[in-house]
Design a protein with these regions (language model features):
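Bacterial N-terminal signal peptides
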Residues: 7-19
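Positively charged n-region of N-terminal signal peptides that target proteins for export
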Residues: 1-6
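Extracellular/lumen-exposed scaffold segments
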Residues: 23-165
Length: 165
């Protein structure tokens, strides 16, 4: 009996000591399953012009997020918020269609993103736009593995525009 109690305490102490060390070495927290692969700018960023930022996001293998239009109202959808920037008009974000995925333990299929997916952001540049220009954005998502979902996360993104000579 004493051996079981000691083993239990040893597990608790190990978790308390090792978890912060793992985070300090750059390991992700539970649910941090999305990473930014690239931000591509389509079009020429010139004052008075229009461009589209294509944001490529990669989810870790075995994870999914609910699409921008979740299949059930209680699920948290994936949403990109683009902050205002001087000289920029932000258009409606384009989201990919979700994939229908049957998850064990749930009655209805889910509308999800898996693997790599792309978001598009149309940007109108005013005549007063000054380059280089950085437009901050945040991707809010909830990563899940099967029916197990983690706390919602935020992925910070920078959309960088530089005028071409």
């Amino acid at each position: 009996m004493k051996h079981l109690i000691f083993s239990g305490w040893l597990c608790v102490v190990s978790a308390l000591v090792l978890a912060p060390a793992a985070l300090a070495q750059g390991q992700r927290k539970l649910g941090e399953a999305a990473s930014l692969q690239a931000v591509e700018i389509k079009g020429d960023p010139i004052p008075g012009g229009k461009v589209t930022a294509v944001i490529k996001v990669q989810l870790e293998k075995g994870f999914h997020t609910h699409s921008n239009k979740p299949s059930e109202p209680q699920f948290i959808g994936t949403v990109l918020t683009v902050d205002p920037a001087p000289g920029v008009r932000v258009g409606a974000v384009g989201y990919p269609a979700g994939k229908s995925e049957k998850v064990a333990g749930l009655d209805k299929p889910l509308s999800v993103y898996q693997g790599e997916f792309e978001l598009s952001v149309p940007l109108g540049l005013t005549a007063a736009a000054k380059f280089p220009l950085t437009i901050p954005a945040t991707l809010r998502y909830q990563a899940c593995q099967g029916a197990q979902c983690y706390a919602p996360q935020k992925l910070k993104i920078e959309i960088k525009l530089e005028s071409k000579p």
